[in-house]
UniProtKB/Swiss-Prot annotation:
InterPro entries: FAD-linked_oxidoreductase-like, PRODH_bac_arc, Proline_DH_dom, Proline_oxidase. Optimum pH is 7.5-8. Its EC number is 1.5.5.2. The active site is at D129, R179. This is Proline dehydrogenase 1. Substrate binds at K95, R283, R284. Keywords: FAD, Flavoprotein, Nucleotide-binding, Oxidoreductase, Proline metabolism. The record marks Y270 as: Critical for catalytic activity. FAD binds at M130, Q158, K182, G183, A184, T221, H222. One of its GO terms (biological process) is proline catabolic process to glutamate. It catalyses: L-proline + a quinone = (S)-1-pyrroline-5-carboxylate + a quinol + H(+). Its cofactor is FAD.
Length: 302
C-alpha cells in the first residue's frame, strides 16, 4: 500500500514544484549528490577513491517546454565535459523525457544526437534510462537508431515487464549494453509482474539471457539473492569480469558497494544531481518505505 502511495506522489506536479523550491533538505541528500555538477564531481571523486565507478544523472523528466529540454541537454553536455576534465571513472545516464520526448520524438532525437556527439568526442559512455511503460516503445526505437551511430550507448530493461526477454532477443543484432533492473514505476498487471517473486525469477532469467549472449550486462540491484545468483552464473560459465558489472544507487547500501568492489567486481554507483529531485526520491522511498524516516528527519531539523 505504501509503495503505491509514494509512486502516486512521485507523479504529483504540485509537490514536485514545491520540493524543487524547498531543496534537498527533505531527506533527499542521502540519495542525491547535490544541486550542481560540481557537487556531483566531488561525490564521484570520493567514490572513485573507494574503488567504485559511477554514472552521473542530471535529474529531470517530462520537460514541459523546449526551453526546459534545451536546458537539460546543455547540462548533459556540461556533465560529459566535467567527467572528461576531472578524469572521472564515470558514465552519463539520461531520460528521454527530460530532453523533450513528450514534446516530440524529433526534438528528443536531436538533443540526444548532440549529446552523443559530445560524448564521442570525450570518449564517455551514455545510458538511456527506461521510464514508465508509456515511453517504452519509443525509448527502444530511439536506442536502436542511435546505437548504430554511437557504439558506447546503452539502455535499460526492466525485469517486471513480461515482454523483457523478447525485447532483449530482438536487440541481439545490436550487441546491446544493457542495464537490467527490477523496475520502479507503477505499472498495470496487464504488462508487469504484480509480485516480487515473479519479478525476481524473471530478473534472473534475463541476467542469464544477456550474459550468455556475450553482451555487456550491468546487473542493477541491491538484492543479495540476485547478486549471489549472478556470481554463481559467471563462475559456472567462466564469464570474464570485463563483460559485466554490478550497479547500485547512491546512498543505498554503500558498505555493500565497497564489499563488491573489494571482491574484484566492477561496481558502478548511480549518482543523481540537480534540483528536480522529487520524483526520483519518491520512487526510492516506494522501493523501501523505511526510507521515509529520512524525510521526517529532514523536516524536524528545520
Amino acid at each position: 500500500m505504501l509503495r503505491h502511495v509514494f509512486l502516486f506522489l512521485s507523479q504529483n506536479k504540485t509537490l514536485t514544484k514545491f520540493a524543487k523550491a524547498y531543496g534537498t533538505r527533505l531527506g533527499a541528500r542521502r540519495f542525491v549528490a547535490g544541486d550542481t555538477i560540481e557537487s556531483a564531481v566531488k561525490t564521484v571523486k570520493r567514490l572513485n577513491r573507494s574503488g567504485l565507478c559511477a554514472t552521473i544523472d542530471y535529474l529531470g523528466e517530462y520537460a514541459a517546454s523546449e526551453k526546459e529540454a534545451n536546458q537539460v541537454a546543455e547540462e548533459c553536455k556540461k556533465a560529459i565535459q566535467a567527467i572528461a576534465e576531472h578524469q572521472l571513472d564515470s558514465e552519463l545516464s539520461l531520460k528521454l523525457t527530460s530532453i523533450g520526448l513528450d514534446l516530440s520524438e524529433e526534438l528528443a532525437l536531436t538533443h540526444l544526437r548532440a549529446i552523443l556527439s559530445v560524448a564521442k568526442q570525450y570518449d564517455v559512455a551514455v545510458t538511456i534510462d527506461m521510464e514508465d511503460y508509456s515511453h517504452y516503445e519509443q525509448t527502444l526505437s530511439i536506442y536502436r537508431q542511435c546505437k548504430q551511430e554511437f557504439e558506447k550507448l546503452g539502455t535499460v530493461i526492466q525485469a517486471y515487464l513480461y515482454r523483457a526477454a523478447e525485447d532483449i532477443k530482438k536487440m541481439r543484432d545490436l550487441k546491446p549494453n544493457l542495464r537490467l533492473v527490477k523496475g520502479a514505476y507503477k505499472e498495470s498487471a496487464a504488462v508487469a509482474f504484480p509480485d516480487k517473486r515473479g519479478t525476481d525469477l524473471h530478473f534472473q532469467s534475463l541476467i542469464k539471457l544477456q550474459l550468455l549472449s556475450g553482451n555487456y550486462t550491468a546487473v542493477a540491484t541491491h538484492d543479495d539473492d540476485i547478486i549471489k545468483f549472478t556470481k554463481q552464473l559467471v563462475a559456472e560459465h567462466r564469464i570474464p569480469a570485463s563483460q559485466f558489472e554490478f550497479q547500485m544507487l547512491y546512498g543505498i547500501r554503500p558498505e555493500r558497494q565497497k564489499e563488491l568492489a573489494k571482491e574484484g567486481y566492477r561496481m558502478r554507483v548511480y549518482v543523481p544531481y540537480g534540483t528536480d529531485w522529487f520524483s526520483y526520491f519518491m520512487r526510492r522511498i516506494a522501493e523501501r518505505p523505511a526510507n521515509a524516516a529520512f524525510v521526517l528527519k529532514g523536516i524536524l531539523k528545520k
